[in-house]
Design a protein with these regions (language model features):
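Short, small/polar residue-rich loop motifs at catalytic or cofactor-binding pockets
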Residues: 98-100
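Residue-level recognition of short loop/turn positions
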Residues: 3, 109-110
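A short, polar/charged loop-to-alpha-helix boundary motif
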Residues: 124-134
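Short, structured beta-strand/loop micro-motifs enriched in basic residues and often containing a Trp
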Residues: 95
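Short, surface-exposed charged micro-motifs
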Residues: 84, 103-105
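Short, surface-exposed loop or secondary-structure junction motifs
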Residues: 1-89
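Short, well-ordered beta-strand elements
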Residues: 105, 111-120
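Solvent-exposed loop/turn segments at secondary-structure junctions
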Residues: 30, 120-123
Length: 141
């Protein structure tokens, strides 16, 4: 508000998640915490295992995180597309973004995950791509 105090807007989008789904859209409407999302990303980085528990088989994770598009077909944003996310054919990173400008990427080459979470609508991924670039520049280069 004008005094700098956080307030919940009327008709907040979170109310939509309490209603029964009328359209099933894969990950559409998926709600989680940053902590759980980071654990999910870490599980993918670990090849399907988290804290000693096997969640997915390693070949499944490798298939998920590799380009599945036929030769000659390119996903405009990153060049490739895995099973449930984009695959960057330039740097081998796998990830996805969400409606409220959320972003995650798994970088197996550099053994790291990067998450950038805002709750900004309409969707704008530009900040997250720049953030990812700066994180890699600071840590890897």
């Amino acid at each position: 508000d004008k005094s700098g105090k956080l307030i919940r807007p009327e008709n907040a989008m979170q109310d939509n998640f309490k209603k029964p789904a009328t359209l099933f859209s894969g990950g559409g409407g998926l709600v989680t915490t940053v902590e759980d999302y980071s654990r999910f990303a870490q599980m993918l980085l670990n090849g399907g295992e988290l804290e000693g528990v096997r969640i997915l088989q390693e070949p499944t994770v490798k298939m998920m995180m590799s380009d599945q598009l036929p030769e000659g077909v390119v996903y405009e944003e990153t060049g490739g597309y895995g099973l449930g996310g984009s695959y960057n054919t330039q740097n081998g990173q796998y990830g996805w973004s969400g409606a409220a400008s959320t972003f995650f990427t798994v970088d197996t080459e550099n053994d790291m995950v990067v998450l950038a979470f805002t709750q900004f609508m309409p969707f704008d991924i530009g900040y997250a791509l720049e953030f990812n670039k700066n994180v890699h520049r600071a840590i890897v280069e």
